[in-house]
A protein has these predicted regions:
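Bacterial Sec-dependent N-terminal signal peptides
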Residues: 1-28
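A short, amphipathic beta-strand motif
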Residues: 29-37, 47, 142
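Short, ordered, surface-exposed loop/turn motifs in non-cytosolic proteins
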Residues: 40-55
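A glycine-anchored, Pro-Gly-centered beta-turn/N-cap motif
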Residues: 71, 76, 81-84
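A short tyrosine-centered beta-strand micro-motif
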Residues: 85-89
Length: 147
């Protein structure tokens, strides 16, 4: 082995640790929201995380939006501070960024809360759908309902 081959081998073996290689564990500190039971692949899926009862179901939320896919869809939230959160998901079929309701107030689009929780004649209270996020990787499930 000549001098150039030796240095090439050294660079390849030891230099590879300094290359920017995507980390396979990039999701370990992320919260994954698994939206289940999406009944069609049109419209958008909105996922909102609320930090308190005071901002629950108001516009002050940590949110993400993805194109709808029939079946299940995973949406990742990274860099969330530890704390209590409530999650709400809507399947916005017409793109107006709201949960459309009929004249009786019954949702016309898909919606869901943590673990499929339902309220009596309205959304469930914050206390029923909150969870504690400790900053470590986790996955939660939100099944959608269509009425």
């Amino acid at each position: 082995m000549d001098k150039w081959e030796y240095w090439l081998l050294v660079v390849l073996v030891f230099g590879s640790q300094f290359l920017s290689i995507p980390d396979a564990t990039a999701q370990k500190n992320s919260l994954i929201v698994n939206v289940k039971n999406i009944n069609r692949s049109e419209g958008k899926i909105y996922v909102a995380l609320y930090t308190s009862n005071a901002n629950y179901l108001k516009n002050d939320a940590i949110s993400k939006c993805e194109n709808a896919l029939e079946g299940n869809l995973e949406i990742e939230f990274s860099d969330l501070p530890p704390g209590e959160y409530a999650v709400c998901v809507i399947h916005d079929l017409n793109g107006n960024e709201n949960l459309d309701k009929n004249f009786l107030g019954v949702p016309k689009e898909g919606f869901g809360f943590l673990n499929g929780m339902m309220g009596n004649f309205g959304p469930p209270p914050f206390e029923k759908v909150k969870f504690t996020w400790n900053g470590a990787g986790a996955k939660i499930e939100v099944p959608l309902r269509y009425l």
